[in-house]
Regions:
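C-terminal soluble interaction/assembly domains
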Residues: 82-199
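A small/polar active-site loop signature that marks catalytic segments
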Residues: 1-117
Length: 199
């Protein structure tokens, strides 16, 4: 809003105080995991942005995505390899730069800190629906992951359980491809299917 007003030649300092006698407090209506499940299943980028702001209020006391990201990168994610660059909550910006190595490290950290039961209940599995449904419906108990797609980019990161019971963490990031997105996703599926079936 301030940017829009500034373009119109209107400037005024922000007034940051409540009306007398009014104390604003958060009102929580949903459990975190149920919100995360919805966001992951439907790839809801708006939810992702709002959750980052809500996390910011808890972590820094501000509804500021940049401040929140900076705080998380300096504390919680300071040990991630390859120095990721993270700029938004939804992952839609091409300025986000994170390696498969960093994604795998983050996924392993999540599993260790939150436990497999919780993490697997939030991520979409191959038979559940969402963006995995068309490619992994024949592996409903073997793939727990999240896709990401932009023009010329296709990603899939998560966990797989092989038919021999091994759990592996993986991350595919295919950048600047010229092929149809479906062909890229099929190639990734072929690789993961071989790992599930034979390892």
């Amino acid at each position: 809003m301030a940017d829009t007003l500034s373009k119109l030649g209107i400037s005024s300092p922000a007034i940051r105080k409540s009306a007398p006698g009014i104390d604003f407090k958060p009102f929580y209506t949903q459990h975190t995991d149920s919100v995360l499940q919805f966001m992951m299943l439907h790839s809801d980028n708006f939810f992702a942005e709002q959750l980052l702001l809500m996390a910011g209020r808890e972590i820094t006391g501000k509804l500021a995505d940049r401040t929140t990201i900076d705080s998380l990168m300096k504390k919680d994610h300071k040990d991630l390899p390859d120095h990721p660059r993270w700029v938004d909550g939804s992952g839609l910006s091409r300025n986000n730069l994170i390696s498969p190595h960093a994604f795998v490290a983050l996924l392993n950290k999540m599993k260790k800190e939150f436990g497999w039961k919780r993490v697997s209940s939030i991520l979409v599995n191959g038979g559940e629906g969402g963006t995995l449904k068309d490619y992994y419906s024949d592996y409903p108990e073997n793939i727990f992951a999240k896709t990401g797609t932009l023009n010329g980019q296709a990603t899939l990161s998560g966990y797989l359980i092989t038919k021999k019971g091994r759990m592996l963490t993986f991350s595919f990031l295919v950048n600047n491809h010229q092929a149809p997105a479906g062909a890229v996703k099929s190639a990734v599926k072929n690789t993961l299917s071989k790992i599930i079936d034979h390892y």
